[in-house]
Amino acid sequence: MWGVTPTRLSSAAMKRGVIAAFAAAVAALSVSGPATAEPGQPAPASTGIHKIQHVIVIMQENRSFDEYFGTYPGADGIPRAANGVPSVCSPDPTTHACVKPYHNTHDQNLGGPHGPKHAVADIDSGKMDGFLTEARRPAACIKKTGNPDCATVDSSKSPDVMGYHNGSDIPNYWAYASNFVLQDHMFEATAAGSWTSHMYTVSEWAAKCSTPNDASTCKTSLPAPKSMNGVEYPWTDLTYLMHKNQVSWNYYISKGSEPDCEDDAQTCGPRPQGVTTYGIWNPLPYFDDVKQDGDLTKIQDVSNFYQAARAGTLPKVSWVAPNQTVSEHPPSLISTGQTYVTNLINTVMKGPEWNSTAIFLAWDDWGGFYDHVAPPKVDQGGFGMRVPAMVISPYAKRGFIDHSPLSLDVYTKFIEDDFLGGQRLDPATDGRPDPRPTVRETLPQVGDLSADFDFNQTPRPPLVLPLRPHTDLTKSSTGSSSTGVIVIVIAIIVVGAVLAFVAFSVRRRRRAKVLVPSH
């Protein structure tokens, strides 16, 4: 533990008179953050967790732990028999076979449906065998641009939800794991998709409110809103506490597009995404406290992140959200996402603030891909599926695998412990009551990251990696044969039309020459 005590006190403790008051005062001193110098004196050196002056949360999309690290040495990966063959499988209702996890070298994957009801079905009361059943459902996706097999899954081939990748496919991600910290029991905050994960990342709750701007009418909700138009979030998010405590922050967003749905689709048509657009990956513009605090300008384009990292002007807290192209959200390419993440991390490592930075890299949900570890049940919302996650920092232990049960809530908890003296997003203490059923950061199942750091070690040097490393990934995708055929047919039609037009033009010119009278 960090030695940081949350400021929330029980009613019993407050009845113990003078002794309790004294204890509370001592506790308050213990959570007051880094020591400050007397006027005219040099500032004392930061110690422990407070050596981290910059927290960066990089959130990628839709991959399970077993899909990316199921064969990583020493991790709780895909169970295997003595001969090395996977000993687990998922029933395929179409072929009636039980499909084992297999090495998938395709750069483009399709994944499976990944909303709340699909999480329940995939988990299947802890049996973890519903992945192919969900991927095979005729309504498992909505027919939109970008999903060649949508609504008409070919019974001759299996969806790729049982596929996994190894270190030859994603070498940079495995390099970060082997040089820093890999967390092999990190669970998404809720058994749902992207919307709830991003909501919990900034506010530790996802809810829908029957009356706009009235937090008392809000109730926990896992499905994403059917429409993002006119949505408002009146409960407290983490930026409110940071604003009140003068802790700098920015939410960096990549301009482009994001999927316009998540619950019933493997992939969806894109919707525009930018600094001012509301979306499942950019939730803060919806929060009323962000508007009231005048902090909408802190939601910025990712280009500002690169500039700040190079100049040494990063805020205390940075969230970095991708666009569709670089997100790794199927059907986007894995290699493109890896290049994007590597560029973010390289830029920080080359900058002047690397020695005081902690980067938390994670994927927001499982994307319908297989994972063999059943998540713990902590409240009505979660936890959700296991996802890849890493800690990258000069104070991160080298090559350490953290087997502790964790959830993505732990990032908020770390920020609160480092910069807010342990204060939680708690209606009892933050001055903005809301009816959230639990204060997530106080749940013991959330865990903490104290095992992942060694603040007594000499700061680790940067690990600058190639942006486009050699990989064994191939550019064709599982189930993409139909796409290839369609492309070929379209190409033939286009070429044929061009040739026909040329032939017609030639004949017309010849006819015109014949009809011209001679003089």
Language-model-detected regions and their locations in the chain:
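Bacterial N-terminal signal peptides that target proteins for export
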Residues: 2-21
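Core hydrophobic alpha-helical transmembrane segments of single-pass membrane proteins
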Residues: 24, 489-501
